[in-house]
């Protein structure tokens, strides 16, 4: 995921925005001119949020991180 890419967030919310900032723990997305921050917990809550970015097609972003005993792949 790179800054400037379009991202679609579905689940409890259904929005499309532009990725503004990406770090190991957060993603900031500009949606309708407002920056919204999503955390690692948001990515982990697969029942709440699913993240897609737009390139040639939509695909799900599953961050690969290790936090203590938590291993998300």
List each language-model region with its residue ranges.
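Short coil-to-beta transition motif at edge beta-strands of beta-rich domains
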Residues: 1-11
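Secondary-structure boundary/capping motif
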Residues: 4, 28, 53-56
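Conserved beta-strand residues within beta-sheet cores
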Residues: 4-6, 16, 58
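Generic short N-terminal amphipathic or hydrophobic helices
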Residues: 6-8, 25, 60-61
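Basic/aromatic-rich interaction segments and small domains that mediate binding to polyanionic partners
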Residues: 12-47
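Intrinsically disordered, low-complexity, charged/polar segments
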Residues: 34-73
């Amino acid at each position: 995921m790179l800054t400037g890419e379009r991202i679609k967030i579905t689940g409890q919310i259904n929005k499309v925005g532009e990725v503004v900032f990406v770090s190991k723990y957060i993603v900031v997305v500009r949606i309708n001119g407002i920056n919204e921050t999503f955390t690692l917990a948001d990515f982990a809550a697969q029942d709440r949020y699913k993240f897609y970015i737009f390139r040639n097609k939509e695909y799900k972003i599953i961050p690969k991180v290790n936090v203590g005993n938590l291993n998300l792949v």
